[in-house]
């Protein structure tokens, strides 16, 4: 925290009204050391996605080496809809359902906001960073699995990833 009197702050992954029932139930449960992952939404069979890509105007392909294929597409400045397992609960896409794009291309940020998500152009995005590289990009040593905190990016790195830099350098 940038406030010296706050040593630690926990923000749950679902801070909206949908989190109230969770917290109420959690208060009646035995204490645990760690909050479980937020993947409590519905799961969909691969077959339902394979049968209906045209319904959503998507191009669906199944690859043996999906990570390599996605990296190649991102390198070509393509936008990838990532969908796996159960959906997250809450407002943040935490990796089970995410829109992936090349963070070096500011025009992709604007395109996703306007055409894909249909939201205001100023709305920020979050970057996924390999843990070993977080010190190269971030000003704090943090682990934010629920994307509940905005973290400042090192000044010298911001120009390298303009699509995920907000006006406040987070």
Predicted regions and their residues:
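Flexible beta->alpha loop and helix N-cap segments adjacent to enzyme active/binding sites
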Residues: 2-170
């Amino acid at each position: 925290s940038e406030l010296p009197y706050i040593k630690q702050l926990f923000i749950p992954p679902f801070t909206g009204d949908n989190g109230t029932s969770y917290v109420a139930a959690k208060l009646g449960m035995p204490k645990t050391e760690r909050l479980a992952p937020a993947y409590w939404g519905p799961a969909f069979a691969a077959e339902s996605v394979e049968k209906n890509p045209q319904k959503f105007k998507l191009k669906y392909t199944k690859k043996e080496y999906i990570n390599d294929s996605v990296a190649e597409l991102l390198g070509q400045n393509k936008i990838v809809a990532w969908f796996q397992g159960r959906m997250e609960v809450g407002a943040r896409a935490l990796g089970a359902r995410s829109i992936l794009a090349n963070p070096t291309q500011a025009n992709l940020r604007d395109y996703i906001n306007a055409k894909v998500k249909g939201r205001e152009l100023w709305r920020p995005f979050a970057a996924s960073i390999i843990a070993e590289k977080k010190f190269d990009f971030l000003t704090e040593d943090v682990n934010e699995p629920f994307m509940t905190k905005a973290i400042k990016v090192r000044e010298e790195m911001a120009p390298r990833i303009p699509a995920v830099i907000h006006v406040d350098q987070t």
